[in-house]
Amino acid sequence: MTAEAAMVLPAMVAVTAALVWVLSLVLGQVRVVDAAREGARVAARGDGEAAAVAAARRVAPSGATVSVVRSGDTVTVTVTARLDGPGGVVGSLPGAEVAADAVAAVEVGV
């Protein structure tokens, strides 16, 4: 191994780890958005708050918090999750909190 390669290899590993971390944050955000949408859909159908929370938690990352607020003819579901950093060699990368809201119109007759 040349000296140049020995100098570049740690930087390449760090950049790769950072890219994996960013990708995991993006995937976590997508799961939170999907969970909020699913919860809002169930709540808008009239299945009740407990069913909406359960539906959202099935899709959300583990440990996520789900809230359902019904206001007039709309229902808003908010999902928030704390995503841990990657740990290991790159343990200095922080975790992040991701959140999403979904609003749905309550179906007529519900």
Model-assigned labels for residue ranges:
Residues 45, 49-110:
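Short, conserved structural patches
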